[in-house]
């Protein structure tokens, strides 16, 4: 699993308003999803992450990209052509 692609996919889905979002939607393990979301929050790419049972949750309302997160999407724009929708995400992040 490519961590950078997973992080990009999570940012892209939040940006597109495709929340709520979970590991089941992306096809990764709970730990992989939690690690990616925690990284994105800790490094200042996203805000509005809710926590329950010591896990991050990306609900319909709340998660937003910061300016840093938006810049990450722009800087990795070449991935945008390869990644179009959440339907393709499971194969794309491998």
UniProtKB/Swiss-Prot annotation:
InterPro entries named among the record's database cross-references: Phage_Tuc2009_YjcQ, WH-like_DNA-bd_sf, WH_DNA-bd_sf
Pfam family, one: YjcQ
Induction: Expression is sigma D-dependent.
SUPFAM superfamilies: Winged helix' DNA-binding domain
Protein name: Uncharacterized protein YjcQ
Organism of derivation: Bacillus subtilis (strain 168)
């Amino acid at each position: 699993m490519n961590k950078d692609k997973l992080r990009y996919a999570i940012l892209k889905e939040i940006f597109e308003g495709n929340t709520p979002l979970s590991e089941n939607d992306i096809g990764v393990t709970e730990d992989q999803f939690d690690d990616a979301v925690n990284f994105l929050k800790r490094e200042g790419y996203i805000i509005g992450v809710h926590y329950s049972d010591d896990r991050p949750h990306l609900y319909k309302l709340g998660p937003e990209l910061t300016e840093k997160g938006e810049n990450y999407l722009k800087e990795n724009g070449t991935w945008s052509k390869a990644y179009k929708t959440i339907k393709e995400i499971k194969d794309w992040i491998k």
